[in-house]
Amino acid sequence: MGRGVGLQSAKGSSTSGYVQRSLAHDNRDDKTGIVRLKNKNYELRKITKRSQKVDKPANESKDNGLKKVLVEHDKRREIEVQVSELRDSLEDKQDRNPDEWPDKRIDEECEKLRSTLLADLQEKEKYQKAYTPRSKRSSESSK
């Protein structure tokens, strides 16, 4: 072990020889409450890691484009799920009564539903672009 800490050899000690940091020892000064840096390099690395973690949300704009693409994909996927559910139900009706539900009519019904759902989605997106939530406005004004 380095720096004279721990066992020189774990052999015969019935332990692994691993030495843990003592959680009971506090590096705070009793009067001021400030942490004293005994192992300066380690403490400084720890502090810089914390500050880097805090800075990450500011770089969120890089991921914003990806998030928009994923959200749009999920919405379109939900539309396709609804269309496929309609197709399944119409095909079940076709099995019971083939003359009433030919394949062409099923395709037309599915396309009609898809077009109405896509139109609704585009209308919602138009309104979302016109309105910006207060939380976004306050973060943009602080920049």
From Swiss-Prot:
GO cellular component term of the entry, any: cytoplasm
Pfam family, one: cwf21
Protein's GO biological process: mRNA splicing, via spliceosome
Coiled coil segments of this chain: 72-129
Protein's UniProt keywords contain Coiled coil: yes
Compositionally skewed regions (Polar residues) per UniProt: 10-19
Record-linked InterPro entries: CWC21, mRNA_splic_Cwf21_dom
Keyword line: Coiled coil, Cytoplasm, mRNA processing, mRNA splicing, Nucleus, Spliceosome
Subcellular location: Cytoplasm; Nucleus
Domain of life: Eukaryota
Domain CWF21, first and last residues per copy: 71-120
Database matches in CDD domains: cwf21_CWC21-like
Subunit structure comment from the entry: Associates with the NTC complex (or PRP19-associated complex). The NTC complex associates with the spliceosome after the release of the U1 and U4 snRNAs and forms the CWC spliceosome subcomplex reminiscent of a late-stage spliceosome.
UniProt record similarity statement: Belongs to the CWC21 family.
Protein name, entry field: Pre-mRNA-splicing factor CWC21
